[in-house]
A protein has these predicted regions:
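Generic detector of short alpha-helix boundary/capping microenvironments
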Residues: 21-24, 164
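Serine/threonine-rich low-complexity intrinsically disordered regions
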Residues: 8-10, 29, 67
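Gly-Asp-aromatic-enriched flexible segments
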Residues: 36-197
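C-terminal segment of classical bacterial N-terminal signal peptides
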Residues: 24-33
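Short, Lys/Arg-enriched N-terminal segments with co-localized hydrophobic residues
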Residues: 2-4, 33-35
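Bacterial N-terminal signal peptides that target proteins for export
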Residues: 3-20
Length: 197
């Protein structure tokens, strides 16, 4: 009889431990998923990058992280209308043979341009360290132009397109924008999800 009681008590203990572990997993799962968020990037958010430019529309703050980890950006839906003629593109952008004399944001990032343009209107991003974002006067526009004292340096711009996962080594903010330079006639935008540490 005593042996039967011990076996029953052991089973009850195991059941309680198993139930507790299941509850912990259920509570932890939504916490992890909570780091993913939806972001809309308007079709005119060029960050004042490129040459010539017509509007200083800042990049969109998409995700702020407090330390190292992996950030994932995934295109969900949307198109950008690039001009008054109604030309549209998806997140990978389009090529432009008639854009000679224009430097797009990704060209500026590489220190090139003024020739054939690829990825025009594409979804692009930049990760800015927290130390720069917190400086007085910071805005998510081109920091090499006279528009402000503290901005984003173009060398950090990168193509996201339909999606990108990348690692960051420090606290900071991911900003998203559009690879275009004349944006006054742009409309539409991209819906994306962003997840991070």
């Amino acid at each position: 009889m005593r042996n039967t009681k011990m076996v029953s008590l052991s089973r009850v203990k195991l059941f309680c431990i198993g139930t507790a572990l299941m509850l912990i997993m259920l509570v932890a799962a939504p916490t992890t998923a909570a780091h993913a968020q939806s972001v809309f990037v308007p079709g005119n958010a060029s960050g004042y990058f490129g040459n010539p430019v017509d509007q200083a529309v800042p990049f969109v703050s998409a995700l702020t992280v407090s330390g190292p980890g992996r950030i994932t950006v995934t295109y969900v839906s949307g198109l950008v209308t690039l001009n008054s003629h109604g030309d549209t593109t998806g997140p990978n952008g389009t090529s432009c043979d008639s854009c000679k004399g224009m430097q797009f944001p990704l060209h500026e990032a590489r220190g090139s341009g003024f020739g054939k343009a690829n990825n025009v209107g594409a979804l692009i991003g930049v990760f800015v360290p927290q130390s720069r974002v917190l400086r007085k006067g910071f805005s998510a526009i081109d920091g090499t132009k006279d528009a402000l004292r503290v901005g984003v340096m173009p060398g950090g711009l990168f193509l996201i397109g339909e999606g990108k996962a990348f690692d960051v080594t420090e606290a900071g903010t991911l900003f998203l924008g559009i690879n275009d330079t004349i944006v006054g006639d742009n409309s539409g935008g991209f819906n994306v999800t962003v997840a991070g540490p």
